Curated annotation (Swiss-Prot):
Keyword Amino-acid biosynthesis: yes
EC numbers: 4.2.1.20
Organism: Desulfosudis oleivorans (strain DSM 6200 / JCM 39069 / Hxd3)
InterPro entries linked: Aldolase_TIM, RibuloseP-bd_barrel, Trp_synthase_suA
Name of the protein: Tryptophan synthase alpha chain
Gene3D superfamilies on file: Aldolase class I
PANTHER family per UniProt: TRYPTOPHAN SYNTHASE ALPHA CHAIN, CHLOROPLASTIC (PTHR43406:SF1), TRYPTOPHAN SYNTHASE, ALPHA CHAIN (PTHR43406)
Amino acid sequence: MNRITETFDRLAAKKEKALVGFVTAGDPAIETSEAIIRAMCEAGIDILELGVPFSDPTADGPVIQRSSQRALANGTNLQTVFDMTATLRKTFQGPIILFSYYNPIFRYGAENFYRDAKQAGADGVLVVDLPPEESAELTSCWKGDDFALIRLLAPTTPDGRIGAIAASASGFLYLVSMTGVTGSSGLDTTHIADLCAKVQRHTALPICVGFGVSTADDVAKIAQHADGVVIGSAFERLIEESIGKPDIAGILAERTREYKAATKM
């Protein structure tokens, strides 16, 4: 059994939902980033989404855009991300998903990316801007291997399209809670039940909901209907606000514990 399936099964047995935490690798500095992520994992992150910084993150809002800029400015690249993954894997037992735009992967080479990601201990990848119809070059590298390809679904995805996207995915599905970019404000959780039910009619894959999640109350409401809750911009905003503070890792760990407590049914 792979780490992703094992994690969802273990949490379901405890009547918990997965806390999926996104952090841009190398923000605000490489060593600080490792310390922050390690503290967050120890505090309750179930699945880690490790962001590959990119110069043109069109799907992301200003908070994550700035985090990418800081990471790129200190020299973070794909090799840095692989090195960080390998370091985190020594202590973190949960799944590590690499979160990237396709351009860095294309420049690195799809086969090289898969080889080095797998060797570092990553469990899968989410490529934000790569639709199923254009994924063959990447997915052919690990055909038959237990390496997950996480897919995004939007609230506006037509029913007929949901099935095709889900069929090309593995691990879990990332269901976007609203249209717009990451970190958008005004999350309305009242429609989450209907969104999840619509997707569940097409797949048995776990569904994790993200975009605009910022409070423990948001987490608790989403966790009633989804298998996991994804938090990214709220973590990155807190990192940005805490730059220069000696206990930045502890600050992020405390917020992680608050979010994790809200995933318990």
